[in-house]
C-alpha cells in the first residue's frame, strides 16, 4: 500500500513540471520571504524618523562612490605565502612517495652495541665501545692504565673516570682446570658410594 501511495504522489509532483518551472522563471521579481515582526517595527521606526530613507538607499551617492574608488588595500600578511609553501611541500612529498620502492628487501644488520655509533665524539663524552675498552685495559693492567691516563686519552674528567672504574667491571670467564674438575667429581662420588655400600650391608 505504501508503495502505491508513494508512486501516486511522485507522479502528481511530476505532472506538468516543465510548465510550472517556466512560470516560476518568467516572474520578474521573486516573492520575498516574510519578515519578522521585529524587523517590521524597526522599519516603521526608521521611516518615521526619515520618510525618504528608502529613496536614499535606492539612489547612488556619488561622493561615496568616489571615495570607494580611492580605496586601495595592500596586505603584508605572509599567510598566503605560508600556505603556498606548505602546498608545495605537500606536492613534493607526494612526488617522493610515488617513487619506485627499493628492490632490496633484506633485513639490515644489527649494530654491534645496539645503536649507531657517532663518527664524532665531543670532549667529555665517550661511547660504549670506548668505555668497555678502557675498563678492560684497567682491569688487565691497572698500573699501565690509571684513571689519569685514561682521562687524558679519552678527554674525560678524572673523577668521572674514577667512578666508572670503581662501579663498572667487565665480565670475566673462569674456566676451571680439568685436573681440579676431576678431583671435585671424585670427592663428590665417594660419599655416595659409602652411603650405598652401608645401605646394602644392613638388611
UniProtKB/Swiss-Prot annotation:
Gene Ontology cellular-component annotations: mitochondrion
GO BP: any one term: mitochondrial respiratory chain complex I assembly
Pfam families linked to this entry: UPF0240
Gene inactivation effect: RNAi-mediated knockdown in thoracic muscles is lethal.
Cited InterPro entries: NDUFAF4
Domain of life: Eukaryota
Assembly notes: Together with NdufAF3 associates with mitochondrial complex I assembly intermediates during its biogenesis.
Function according to Swiss-Prot or TrEMBL: Involved in the assembly of mitochondrial NADH:ubiquinone oxidoreductase complex (complex I). Together with NdufAF3, involved in biogenesis of complex 1 modules N, Q and P-peripheral, but not the P-distal module. Required for recruitment of the complex I assembly factor Timmdc1 to complex 1 assembly intermediates.
Family indicated by similarity: Belongs to the NDUFAF4 family.
The protein, known as: NADH dehydrogenase [ubiquinone] 1 alpha subcomplex assembly factor 4
Lineage of source species: Eukaryota, Metazoa, Ecdysozoa, Arthropoda, Hexapoda
